[in-house]
Amino acid sequence: MPFSDELARGLAVVAYDRRWPGDFAVLARRVQDVLGPTAVRVCHVGSTSVPGLAAKDCIDIQVEVRALDEELIVGCFGTIGFRLRPEPWNRVEPTPGGPCPKLVFAPPEGDRASNIHVVEAASEAARRKLLFRDFLRAHDTARDSWSDFKQRLAAMAADIYQYGQAKAGPTEILMLAAESWARQAQWSLPWSADGGGSGHSMVPACSPACRRPGCGGGLGGHHSTDP
């Protein structure tokens, strides 16, 4: 569930905002700077990462790490005020291949609305979020239908929890279509071991971990570039 300060924002699915990629870039830089070499990739995922798709005004970021070291990662995010979401569904991502551990962080109170999803690099959970995004980017009809569904659902749902529960089933149905497209189009991630750069790899909005001197990788190595 959202923190109390997040509940005050209410539930609204709004038209696509061209500022969202820039908002992602600012947040991604903060994440890169605080995690340093712990982060392998930082990617824009979720509805705000799909041009033309209506979404809640909340930036979703996926961070891939080599190992999900909870103490280290929670400590790093704590230095910039990000809060670990404690709910069970924010600790494990169910996938067809089995559950994948994850950590999800909320921003400091009063900060720009966001969710930071931390998963193990190249895990099935990481792959599925990027596939879902790329499928909607490649299919205008699916994107527009999903956009309309979410706006209608948001207008009927009592709160963010009911909205999320009602959206879960249709999301999995859409995911089946995405998996079918991935097989037909030979979609693969640009960095996947078996993709080799061939097939329908769509370059994602992802950044490698910060490698500049001063970027932190431990609890005391925070290097801030906050605007």
Predicted regions and their residues:
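Short, compositionally biased low-complexity segments
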Residues: 1-8, 104, 120, 144-148
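Helical scaffold of the NTase/Pol beta-like nucleotidyltransferase catalytic core
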Residues: 1-43
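Short histidine-centered catalytic/ligand-binding loop motif
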Residues: 12-18, 62-66, 131-136
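Active-site nucleotide-donor binding segment shared across nucleotidyl transfer reactions
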Residues: 30-72
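Conserved catalytic core of two-metal-ion nucleotidyltransferases
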Residues: 82-122
